Amino acid sequence: MAARIAVLKISRWLSVVLLFFLAAPAGSFAAEKMNVLFLICDDLNCDLGSYGHPQVKSPNIDRLAERGVRFSRAYCQYPLCGPSRASFMTGLYPDQTTILGNAIRLRERLPGVQSMSQMFIRKGYEAIRIGKIYHYGVPRDIGTDGHDDPKSWTRTVNPKGRDKTDESKVFSLRP
């Protein structure tokens, strides 16, 4: 009999708690939408302070890494920029995207594919591209949209940067 009374008390308590949650406004317990900062770089390996490299000083990236996600087993899908980035942004392997060269635009091969940034947009996020995500010709296309995918962004910014403004230094073998 005591066990039955305990079960009834627990059931009554759970009912009150459940009623409280059902009566609460729908959004009041929703998790706050996280900010997402996605950085993608050409030719960047794990020679960074945040990965324990003793010589490389990368304090800004290290601070971001402390609060974010560091990948320890992430591998490039292809030895060229265009196919690798298309793979990363779609979640498909290069043989699935059929983008095996740099001069191929994503929508030429995959007109209906959903990019990672489009998925964020569908969830109510702003997806802003600053600089290069998909391939573009260097140095000719620096500061332009290049082979970008306009469907993937709510806004774009195309900075020229030092690789364009100091082009002679970039392509020089002298320090």
What are these regions (language model features)?
Residues 5-7, 18, 146:
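Intrinsically disordered, low-complexity regions enriched in Ser/Pro/Gly/Gln/His and often acidic
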